[in-house]
């Protein structure tokens, strides 16, 4: 990928999921209602073993970036979707307890930011580190989204539902697309490089140029 756009590999993962979603939804539809959540959870757990498969790729191709490796992330969203139409149970009660659900998100985030999930730089992770990083990413995403979709669904969030936040959310995708290109310009401007400090300056300039 072109320098400054290396994050775009994730788009192929996302688009692949969207293309497969009708088939996945149909397969879930064929299951008994009570079997759907266990089946989706089982697929999520099984996907963490993707790196154990004897897949040989060309140099520079990382099969840990292929869609099946991130099935747990998409499974988290599918589980939340199932729970939105399920009778009130422990997921709903957990989502309505901010201390517990945000505590789970915080702990998972701290684990994903620790050496257990790999070094801070862009060195390829080991299989164990990849499993920790990916699984904790799924937990963080599910924990942050659960209160929004399971606690008073259909009611606009008093903070995230206001026009300013909705607009920023709409713009955020553009920032995702361009933030690395902005970083490529910002680092020479401030005379620093990745993981070497000047966080505030780099953040401000990247945000301005990214938008």
Can you name each region flagged by the protein language model?
Residues 9-10, 175:
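Active-site alpha-helix of zinc metalloproteases
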Residues 31-41, 90-102, 197-201:
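Membrane-interfacial entry segments at the cytosolic side of transmembrane helices
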Residues 25-33, 191-192:
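Juxtamembrane segments of multi-pass membrane glycosylation machinery
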Residues 2-5, 55-64, 123-129:
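Membrane-interface helix caps and helix-loop-helix hairpins in membrane proteins
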Residues 70, 74, 78-79, 100-211:
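Alpha-helical transmembrane segments of multi-pass integral membrane proteins
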Residues 10-28, 41-91, 107-112, 133-156, ...:
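Specific transmembrane alpha-helix
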Residues 2-5, 9, 72, 161:
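Alpha-helical membrane-protein architecture signal
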């Amino acid at each position: 990928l072109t320098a400054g756009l290396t994050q775009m590999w994730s788009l192929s993962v996302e688009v692949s999921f969207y293309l497969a979603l009708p088939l996945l939804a149909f397969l879930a539809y064929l299951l008994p209602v009570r079997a759907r959540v266990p089946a989706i959870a089982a697929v999520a757990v099984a996907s963490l073993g993707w790196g154990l498969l004897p897949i040989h790729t060309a140099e520079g191709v990382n099969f840990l970036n292929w869609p099946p490796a991130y099935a747990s992330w998409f499974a988290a969203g599918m589980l939340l979707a199932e729970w939105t139409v399920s009778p009130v149970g422990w997921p709903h009660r957990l989502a309505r307890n901010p201390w517990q659900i945000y505590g789970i998100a915080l702990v998972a985030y701290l684990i994903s930011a620790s050496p257990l999930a790999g070094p801070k730089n862009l060195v390829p992770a080991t299989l164990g580190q990849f499993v920790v990083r990916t699984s904790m990413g799924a937990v963080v995403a599910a924990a942050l989204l659960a209160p929004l979709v399971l606690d008073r669904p259909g009611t606009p969030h008093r903070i995230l539902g206001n026009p300013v936040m909705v607009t920023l959310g709409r713009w955020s995708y553009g920032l995702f697309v361009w933030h690395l290109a902005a970083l490529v310009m910002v680092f020479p401007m401030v005379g620093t490089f990745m993981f070497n400090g000047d966080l505030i300056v780099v953040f401000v300039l990247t945000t301005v140029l990214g938008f």
